[in-house]
């Protein structure tokens, strides 16, 4: 496939999107990333509310803890890329296996945060969940770039981030909030806890499933990538 137009310019959006969407691995990884962001933005927006409603902690102290835990997210992004590059030298499927595995490992830790009454233990656990759940981004960007030609890479990043943010920001906080409001008459201030418990586990496993499916097609799709 031609990776630039006849005048030397980069391929247009339509061409890049058509190329990406013809690759089954990208279709599944983009859905996985979108659901991943759905969990991230949904849980992230309501986690402060969970602590303020159900734990004895002041706003300022909570903000400090959560700000510090975001550093772990940066570490997770680096480690996700590092592990994928290291393991991917032997088998490119690791670029999807790393996000899938870290996403599944994340789940029991985040369930502990939602269920425990131990405030500071829950806050310390956010460092673990932050690191694990941010390990997905670098591998998915790397494999997306590998599926396209050099001149398509910027646009392919934009397409992936559009899907990620459309699903994540567009629906994550809205769905968590909607479920919380629906069950509020029954559970009161506990409704945010049960909303997270209803939505997050299913969505997390759903995301990981698409990563595993994408991994099945990675090697074949990389063979078709423009050189």
What are these regions (language model features)?
Residues 77, 147-185:
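A late C-terminal transmembrane helix in Major Facilitator Superfamily
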Residues 107-115, 197-227:
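Multi-pass alpha-helical transporter architecture, strongest
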Residues 120-136:
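Hydrophobic core of transmembrane alpha-helices in multi-pass small-molecule transporters
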Residues 23-80, 133-141, 168-176:
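Extracytoplasmic gate region of multi-pass secondary transporters
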Residues 85-102:
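Cytoplasmic membrane-interface "Motif A"-like loop-to-helix N-cap segments
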């Amino acid at each position: 496939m031609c990776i630039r137009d006849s005048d030397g310019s980069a391929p247009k959006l339509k061409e890049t999107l058509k190329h990406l969407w013809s690759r089954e691995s990208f279709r599944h990884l983009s859905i996985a990333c979108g659901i991943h962001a759905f969990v991230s933005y949904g849980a992230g927006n309501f986690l402060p509310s969970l602590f303020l409603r159900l734990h004895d902690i002041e706003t300022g102290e909570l903000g400090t803890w959560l700000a510090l835990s975001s550093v772990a997210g940066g570490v997770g992004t680096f480690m996700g890329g590092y592990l994928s590059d290291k393991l991917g030298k032997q088998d490119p499927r690791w670029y999807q296996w790393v996000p899938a595995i870290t996403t599944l490992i994340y789940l029991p830790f985040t369930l502990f945060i939602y269920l425990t009454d131990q405030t500071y233990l829950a806050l310390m656990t956010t460092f673990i969940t932050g690191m694990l759940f941010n390990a997905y981004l670098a591998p998915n960007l790397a494999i997306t770039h590998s599926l396209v030609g050099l001149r398509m890479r910027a646009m392919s990043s934009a397409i992936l981030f559009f899907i990620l943010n459309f699903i994540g920001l567009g629906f994550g906080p809205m769905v968590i909030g909607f479920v919380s409001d629906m069950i509020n008459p029954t559970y009161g201030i506990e409704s945010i806890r049960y909303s997270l418990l209803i939505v997050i586990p299913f969505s997390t496993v759903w995301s990981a499933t698409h990563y595993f499916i994408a991994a099945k097609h990675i090697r074949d799709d990389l063979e078709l990538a423009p050189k």
